[in-house]
Amino acid sequence: SLRRQRQMCIRDRRILVDPVFETASPLPFFNRPFEGTDLYKPEDMPGIDLLVITHDHWDHLDYGTVTKLRDRTGRVVCPLGVGEYFEYWGFDPQRITELDWGEQAALGGGFTVYCRPARHFSGRTFRANRTLWASFVVETPSQRIFLGGDGGYDTHFADVAREFPNLDVAVLEDGQYSEDWRYIHMLPADLKRAVEDLGARRVFPVHNSKYALARHPWDEPLNNAAALAAENPEAGIVLPRIGEPVRLDRSDTLPGRWWTAPEN
């Protein structure tokens, strides 16, 4: 199953991706979560078998969250250089696996994580592009899952589809975009192209609904994704509420527009 906060449970293994349960900023009064979206705290999380971090930006790697999960996390997989943060924050280096683009890590039990490119950047405060950013494919005994991370549209989506045909799930960025950022964040038209390139059975648009990092209306990404789903039902786009579980082994239909005000 997959929950909206990018928590997956597959074959009794719990996988958590880029968890941020606090502010997405080094300053507590910037990028605070929308009211009603902070449904979970790190203390609510069960033991995590695999923690995947796609890059080191504040809205994907949060000190307060990961340190509270430290004693309940079995393995961390991240791009090159990001493991330094985890070591500094007290994680056991033996439980940290850094990967470069094109590398992979076998985790046992039929689980393998593949590190692949993304078109983005990295940096925290004044440390720009000293660590790598990436997308990942998590291969399990029953599923192939693509984790797009952040980034603009490029040929890497088609490359991943050729290397990993018949993807079961794609988790794609959909939100916090701008024409000025089109090379580092996908625009709505780019999401459509990425969905077509990957050809995954199910697509979960994320990176929306919790923080305002761009100037577009907060619900615009959801409306665009819903329109894409209506235009192309075969795309398998799913837009669950935050925290709502979705069975990955079923083809559930698109839920109602939960983000709109109920009609009287």
Model-derived regions: residue spans:
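Metallo-beta-lactamase
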Residues: 79-143, 224-243, 248-254
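Cap/insert and terminal regions of metallo-dependent hydrolase folds
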Residues: 38, 45, 50, 75-84, ...
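Single conserved hydrophobic/aromatic residue that forms the stacking wall/gate
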Residues: 1-6, 10
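Active-site metal-binding loops of divalent metal-dependent hydrolases
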Residues: 19-21, 56, 118-119, 149-151, ...
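Metal-dependent catalytic neighborhoods of phosphoester/phosphodiester hydrolases
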Residues: 62-71, 213-223, 249-250
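Active-site-proximal beta-strand elements of phosphoester/diester hydrolases
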Residues: 14-18, 112-118, 144-150
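Divalent metal-coordination and catalytic microenvironments
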Residues: 18, 55, 62, 76, ...
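Pre-active-site segment of Zn-dependent metallo-hydrolases
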Residues: 13-56, 63-68, 78-81, 123, ...
